[in-house]
A protein has these predicted regions:
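Structured, hydrophobic secondary-structure cores that serve as assembly/anchoring elements
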Residues: 1-88, 99-389
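A broadly used, surface-exposed interaction patch
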Residues: 91-93
């Protein structure tokens, strides 16, 4: 504190001890496929379908993702990353090469921007082995990027029994960062006036996620009357009994009701079957956790330059506490007070002396989601300076 020797008005800037953490975007979608034009194996951001038309020449009968992008913006999407692959939409071109940054790995190049939702509609037209390879790689990639995958089913899966059988065959693809919907959808085809086109639901649902995120928050379940499917209709009618059978296997139903029309009527991840009993069974719980993880990780990079000691741990707890309290106040968690809704641990019990010597600080965050579940716990590891540096 400076010492003032004469009367007067003095202004002093006092540094804040709490670092502000901004929430990251939640519904920026990525699409991978062949397109008529545009940069190859480079992710390009578009913020409207008109912009997509200018950059990639719009709809193409051979490009499933071009229709998915149309549906995405029609249903409320605001930002899309588009990756054009070369040589056809095969497993090899879609997955790409991590070293060369091709295929889905072209999305590495958007940093410091992020994507949150991944759709690969063309995968549904591949043979079984290629489909499995693409979806397995996409789930792994989404896990690394804290993103969520919406999986499209093949056009041949057009009855409830076929869907249940297909899901059992593809049980190896169960993952908490992915969801699947039945049935496929029918949309008007602008390239074939008066006709419709059968499409996967991923683009439509990505738009629904974005619309509901913007209106209610990422913690809101993307299902029910508000989750209407704009410009699309279901290709199979599902009754309550069939809905229950699908739900038991973690398959989300798309339904038509006389009073509300075509809507999403399920919110389970691919880890949401009754047998899995996963804490990540619900889409809003998983996506909220991904949002919190990414926001806290990105918002705590200032710790890279501070000594890894009690002062740093206190600052982290304060900064994280402000962020989580703000989420509590807008209704993201259960509980009547903040202490019931979340907790934060960052001290000598989470960060050992060995961690300190290696410049690592560990933070444990738990929260009570709105969906019926116990406290969900996430772990965040950040690089910090060594004590004395």
């Amino acid at each position: 504190m400076p010492e003032y020797l004469a009367p007067g008005v003095f202004i002093e800037e006092v540094p804040a001890c709490v670092h502000t953490i901004e929430g990251v975007p939640t519904s920026s979608a990525a699409f991978i496929d062949i397109f008529q034009q545009g940069p190859l194996n480079k992710a390009m951001q578009v913020t409207s379908f008109a912009e997509f038309e200018r950059a990639f020449r719009g709809l193409d009968a051979g490009s499933e993702a071009s229709y998915a992008i149309l549906q995405y913006f029609l249903n409320g999407g605001k930002s899309a990353w588009v990756v054009r692959v070369d040589g056809g939409a095969t497993a090899e071109t879609i997955v790409g090469d991590p070293a060369a940054k091709t295929g889905m790995h072209a999305l590495d190049g958007i940093a410091p921007n992020i994507f949150n939702i991944l759709t690969i509609p063309a995968a549904a037209n591949l043979d079984q082995n290629s489909f499995t390879a693409v979806i397995s790689a996409a789930e792994k990639y989404c896990s690394e990027k804290r993103a969520f995958l919406i999986v499209d089913i093949p056009p041949t899966i057009n009855t409830k029994d076929k869907m249940l059988s297909w899901m059992e065959t593809n049980d190896c693809l169960r993952h908490h960062n992915a969801a699947i919907y039945f049935p496929r959808l029918e949309i008007p085809d602008p390239l074939n006036a008066g006709s419709s086109r059968n499409v996967g639901a991923s683009g439509t649902l990505a738009g629904v996620y974005a619309r509901m995120d913007g209106a209610c928050g990422v913690w809101k379940t993307p299902a029910g009357g508000a989750a209407d499917l704009r410009g699309a209709s279901v290709t199979v009618q599902i009754n309550d009994s069939e809905n229950g059978a699908l739900n038991a296997l973690g398959i989300n139903a798309l339904r038509n009701f006389p009073t509300i029309g075509n809507v999403s009527w399920g919110a389970r991840t691919l880890a949401g079957s009754y047998q899995e009993a996963s804490e990540w069974k619900y889409i809003p719980v998983r996506r909220l956790a991904l949002y919190i993880e990414e926001s806290l990780y990105q918002g705590s990079k200032w710790a890279n330059f501070d000594p890894n000691d009690e002062l740093l741990w206190t600052q982290i707890r304060l900064s994280f506490g402000v962020f989580m309290t703000n989420l509590f106040r807008v209704g993201a968690f259960q509980g009547t007070k903040a202490g019931d809704a979340f907790f934060i641990k960052c001290d000598g019990t989470t960060t050992s002396q060995d961690d300190i010597d290696r410049g690592i600080v560990n933070i444990v965050v738990g929260f009570a989601p709105l969906a019926p579940a116990e406290f969900v716990v996430i772990y965040i590891q950040q690089i910090a300076g060594r004590v004395g540096e």
